[in-house]
C-alpha cells in the first residue's frame, strides 16, 4: 500500500530511515534513483514510502525521505531523514548516527549510554530493508538536517538525549491521537472483540500489547494509544471484565489521575514513581536517585527487582481504585509489565 493512502496514519522516524537506507543502497549498487521504496515492518505490513531525493557519487549514494505524521500534531512532521550508503569489507550492516541524531547520555534507555539514539527495533528494520537488496557489507550513515535545532522543542533533553532527535518506532506506523474519529475506531474494535470474548485487554502501546499476548489471546487485546480513560469507559459499557495492561511510564500517569497520556495533557511520571516509592518504604538513598532520574527507565536501574514489584503493586492498586469509579459493577484488573515483558504486578485479576 502507499503510505499516503492511510489518511489518518503516518510513518515513524524509524520507517523513514529504513526507506532512505534502502533507497540509498539501491542507488549505490544498481545506480537506481527510486521515487518510492517498499520496506518491511515488524508487524508484517509492507509500506511503500515516497523518496524525496537520491544522489549517487563514486562509492557512495544518499537518499532522503520526509517523515509523514498523518493527523498527529507532530513537530517532526515533514522532517527530512537522510541516509548515505557505502560498501564495507565485512558482510555486516553497520548503522551510524551522525549530525542531527541525538546521543544517549543517561542509562535506562533502550539505546546504550554513549551511543546514538537509534532504537534496536529501528536498527533491525534498517537491516531487514537492506537485506532485501543485498547480502553485502554496507555502512549506513543516518543524518537529520536541523535535527539538533528541532530536538530543542522535544522532550529528548529530559530523558538524557542531546544533540538531535531520536530515531524510533516499534511498528513503523504512527497512529493518530486525540481525535474523535480515533475513538470511533476504538468503539468499533471493542464491539468486534465483544463478539468472541466477555473481557477485553486494553494496552496503551505496541510493547504492552506484545507482552499481554503472552497471557491472553491476541484477538482479545486492543491498542488504544493515549486515550486510556476514554477506552476504559467505552469498554466498561460493553464487557463484564476490563483488563488494563501496560508498562510503568504510561501507567504512572494514570496513577496520578491523567487518563489521556499524551504529553500535551501533563506529565507526572517521576513524581508518581517517587510518591509510590515513599509509600513502599524504599531507602532514602534510592529515593534520592529516583527523584534525580531523567526517565522511569533510568529510575528502575536504581531499584532491585523486589523494590520494583513492591512499588508497582502500590501503583496498580491506586490505578484500580481510580478506574473502578468509571463503573462499579465491572470487574477491573490492572497488570504492569517490566521493560523486559515480565509481570511486575497484577491486581484485581
From Swiss-Prot:
Entry's EC annotation: 2.1.1.195
Pathway: Cofactor biosynthesis; adenosylcobalamin biosynthesis; cob(II)yrinate a,c-diamide from sirohydrochlorin (anaerobic route): step 6/10
One function term, GO molecular function aspect: cobalt-precorrin-5B C1-methyltransferase activity
InterPro entries: CbiD (IPR002748), CbiD_sf (IPR036074)
One Pfam family, short name: CbiD
Catalytic reaction(s) noted: Co-precorrin-5B + S-adenosyl-L-methionine = Co-precorrin-6A + S-adenosyl-L-homocysteine
Keyword Methyltransferase: yes
Gene Ontology biological process: anaerobic cobalamin biosynthetic process; methylation
SUPFAM superfamilies in the record: CbiD-like
Keywords from the named record: Cobalamin biosynthesis, Methyltransferase, S-adenosyl-L-methionine, Transferase
Enzyme class, UniProt record, top EC level: transferase
Entry similarity comment: Belongs to the CbiD family.
HAMAP family cross-referenced by the UniProt entry: CbiD (MF_00787)
Record's protein name: Cobalt-precorrin-5B C(1)-methyltransferase
Lineage: Archaea, Thermoproteota, Thermoprotei, Sulfolobales, Sulfolobaceae
Gene that encodes the chain: cbiD
Amino acid at each position: 500500500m502507499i503510505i499516503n493512502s492511510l489518511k489518518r496514519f503516518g510513518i515513524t522516524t524509524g520507517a523513514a530511515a529504513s526507506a532512505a537506507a534502502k533507497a540509498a543502497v539501491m542507488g549505490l549498487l544498481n545506480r537506481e534513483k527510486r521515487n518510492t521504496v517498499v520496506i518491511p515492518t515488524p508487524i508484517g505490513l509492507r509500506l511503500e514510502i515516497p523518496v524525496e531525493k537520491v544522489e549517487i557519487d563514486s562509492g557512495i549514494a544518499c537518499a532522503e525521505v520526509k517523515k509523514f505524521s498523518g493527523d498527529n500534531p507532530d513537530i517532526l512532521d515533514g522532517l527530512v531523514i537522510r541516509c548515505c550508503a557505502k560498501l564495507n569489507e565485512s558482510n555486516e550492516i553497520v548503522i551510524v548516527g551522525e549530525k542531527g541524531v541525538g546521543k544517549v547520555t543517561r542509562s535506562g534507555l533502550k539505546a546504550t549510554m554513549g551511543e546514538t539514539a537509534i532504537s534496536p527495533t529501528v536498527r533491525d528494520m534498517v537491516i531487514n530493508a537492506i537485506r532485501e537488496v543485498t547480502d553485502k557489507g554496507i555502512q549506513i550513515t543516518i543524518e537529520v538536517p536541523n535535527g539538533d535545532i528541532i530536538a530543542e522543542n522535544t522532550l529528548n533533553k529530559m530523558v538524557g538525549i542531546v544533540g538531535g532527535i531520536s530515531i524510533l518506532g516499534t511498528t513503523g506506523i504512527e497512529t493518530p491521537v486525540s481525535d474523535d474519529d480515533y475513538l470511533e475506531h476504538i468503539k468499533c474494535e471493542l464491539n468486534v472483540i465483544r463478539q468472541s470474548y466477555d473481557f477485553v485487554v486494553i494496552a496503551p502501546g505496541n510493547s504492552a500489547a506484545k507482552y499481554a499476548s503472552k497471557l491472553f489471546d491476541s484477538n482479545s487485546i486492543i491498542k488504544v494509544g493515549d486515550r486510556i480513560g476514554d477506552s476504559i469507559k467505552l469498554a466498561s459499557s460493553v464487557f463484564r471484565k476490563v483488563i488494563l495492561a501496560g508498562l510503568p511510564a504510561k501507567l504512572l500517569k494514570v496513577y496520578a489521575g491523567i487518563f489521556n497520556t499524551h504529553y500535551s495533557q501533563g506529565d507526572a511520571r517521576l513524581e508518581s514513581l517517587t510518591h509510590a516509592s515513599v509509600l513502599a518504604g524504599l531507602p532514602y538513598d534510592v529515593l534520592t536517585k529516583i527523584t534525580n532520574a531523567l526517565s522511569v527507565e533510568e529510575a528502575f536501574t536504581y531499584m532491585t527487582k523486589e523494590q520494583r514489584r513492591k512499588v508497582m503493586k502500590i501503583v496498580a492498586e491506586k490505578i484500580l481504585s481510580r478506574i473502578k469509579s468509571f463503573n462499579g459493577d465491572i470487574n477491573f484488573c490492572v497488570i504492569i509489565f517490566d521493560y523486559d515483558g515480565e509481570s511486575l504486578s497484577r491486581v484485581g485479576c
